[in-house]
UniProtKB/Swiss-Prot annotation:
This is Translation initiation factor eIF2B subunit gamma. Gene3D superfamilies: Hexapeptide repeat proteins, Spore Coat Polysaccharide Biosynthesis Protein SpsA, Chain A. The gene is Eif2b3. It comes from Rattus norvegicus. GO terms for cellular component: cytoplasm; cytosol; eukaryotic translation initiation factor 2B complex; guanyl-nucleotide exchange factor complex. Acts as a component of the translation initiation factor 2B (eIF2B) complex, which catalyzes the exchange of GDP for GTP on the eukaryotic initiation factor 2 (eIF2) complex gamma subunit. Its guanine nucleotide exchange factor activity is repressed when bound to eIF2 complex phosphorylated on the alpha subunit, thereby limiting the amount of methionyl-initiator methionine tRNA available to the ribosome and consequently global translation is repressed. Signal peptide: none annotated. GO terms for molecular function: guanyl-nucleotide exchange factor activity; translation initiation factor activity. Activated by the chemical integrated stress response (ISR) inhibitor ISRIB which stimulates guanine nucleotide exchange factor activity for both phosphorylated and unphosphorylated eIF2.
Length: 452
């Protein structure tokens, strides 16, 4: 077994709490499938037979009840009261980890050729290989956000070599001063560094086993994304003398605080790179000289996805966009599944757009039009209803003559006759009165947070 796959499904979706207050983030429906289905399906498509899923008890119950995949999940629950980051979660399952690991977030939806990342990891004997994509901004409005001050996303500064594959620098702008400081040892080997600020971390990482060993002893690191990866990137091209000094101090360090141990303390001597002459020539051709590979034991690489679908569903806007994009992806991933479930009862199928999904046991009345939308299971949509660019979750009722545009309607909500809803988020179990006109509102229960 070359890799053990781990899916992180712990985060509560702090940036989309109006949705996740009633539905755990890994179970949010995207294209009528739970969000966590997408990384699990990605693993299954490339031949993984087992996966470790780190999650909560609520998600575990749902997965055990509804899991219909060939992939065998080993579900590990974290304590309910625990506030665990991704690095903490890896430590929690450390006894199960025997090989290099492939870590994915539960909110990743992508059609990436996974071998592109894995091949980098193998070819360069990397400590880390990760997936990034070019940032994409949706032009569609986000439900309930008109007039609100848009949160300014802090950018990552990413530096790569001339091949675009070796990851030489990575830092969030919040952690930077007015100047970028680059280590001289990096500039000696890579005098030209290409910087980009429009890349987004997809939360897909290949990690050497010794990196996980290092994490186990360095409990101050809580996040893979914001702490471990910048640390590994900084540790590249450490001079031989500094490595030797580290080795000389290793015994003393062990006697003191284990958390202070350097990554080089965990790299096995028998893990040093040994390549056949052909491989050495091949790597030299790829502009990573044999000398560089053999001397620099910590190596970080990145595959930057330029085409295809790659989205992390971390905000309400990205959640809406994922539901708009996913019908095309599902037609490839699940060609045997109909866009309209066979059990759905549709009065006028020609009024259902080819870019829409209709779930099981849903009823759609006479002269009702559904375009560019995802409709869940057991919904009731009466006559002369218009639904455009929307997501309706399960068991939603829309009465006669209503119009809904650009909105999310959560489970068991009711929209009474003649209502007009535009760019709204309607929470679980909410009722919109007849002939109401609602625009750019967030309508949730008193027990649900009002933050998006």
């Amino acid at each position: 077994m070359e890799f053990q796959a781990v899916v992180m499904a712990v985060g509560g979706g702090s940036r989309m709490t109006d949705l996740t207050s009633s539905i755990p983030k890994p179970l949010l429906p995207v294209g009528n499938k739970p969000l966590i289905w997408y990384p699990l399906n990605l693993l299954e498509r490339v031949g993984f037979e087992e996966v470790i899923v780190v999650t909560t008890k609520d998600v575990q119950k749902a997965l055990c009840a509804e899991f219909k995949m060939k992939l065998k999940p080993d579900i590990v629950c974290i304590p309910d009261e625990a506030d665990m980051g991704t690095a903490d979660s890896l430590r929690h399952i450390y006894p199960k980890l025997k090989t290099d690991v492939l870590v994915l977030g539960c909110d990743l939806i992508t059609d990436v050729a996974l071998h592109e990342v894995v091949d980098l990891f193998r070819a360069y004997d990397a400590s880390l290989a990760m997936l990034m994509r070019k940032g994409q901004e949706s032009t569609e409005p986000v439900p309930g956000q008109k007039g609100k001050k848009k949160t300014v996303e802090q950018r990552d500064f990413i530096g790569v070599d001339s091949t675009g594959k070796r990851l030489l620098f990575m830092a969030n702008e919040a952690d930077l001063d007015e100047e970028l400081v680059i280590k001289g040892s990096i500039l000696q080997k890579h005098p030209r560094i290409h910087f980009q600020t429009g890349l987004v971390d997809a939360h897909l990482y290949c990690l050497k086993k010794y990196v996980v060993d290092f994490l186990m002893e360095n409990k101050s690191i809580t996040s893979i994304r914001s702490e471990l990866i910048p640390y590994l990137v900084r540790k590249q091209f450490s001079s031989a003398s500094s490595q030797q000094r580290q080795e000389d101090k290793e015994e003393d360090l062990k006697k003191k605080e284990p958390k202070s141990l350097d990554i080089y303390s965990f790299i096995k001597k028998d893990n040093t790179l040994t390549l056949a002459p052909y491989d050495a020539c091949w790597n030299a051709f790829r502009r990573d000289k044999w000398e560089d590979l053999s001397r620099s034991q910590v190596r970080c690489y990145v595959h930057i996805m330029k085409e295809g679908l790659c989205s992390r569903v971390s905000t309400l806007g990205l959640y809406m966009e994922a539901n708009r994009q996913v019908p095309k992806l599902l037609s490839v991933l699940c060609p045997e599944e109909s866009m309209i479930h066979p059990s759905a009862q549709i009065a006028n199928k020609h009024l259902i757009g080819a870019d829409s999904l209709i779930g099981s046991d849903t009823q759609v009345g006479e002269k009702s039009s559904i375009k560019r939308s995802v409709i869940g299971s057991s919904c009731v949509i009466r006559d002369r209803v218009t639904v455009t660019n929307c997501l309706l979750m399960n068991s939603v009722t829309v009465e006669e003559g209503s119009s809904i545009h650009g909105s999310v309607i959560c489970n068991n909500a009711v929209v009474e006759a003649g209502a007009e809803i535009r760019d709204c988020l309607i929470g679980s179990g909410q009722r919109i009165e007849a002939k109401a006109k609602r625009m750019n509102e967030v309508i949730v229960g008193n027990d649900q947070l009002m933050e998006i």
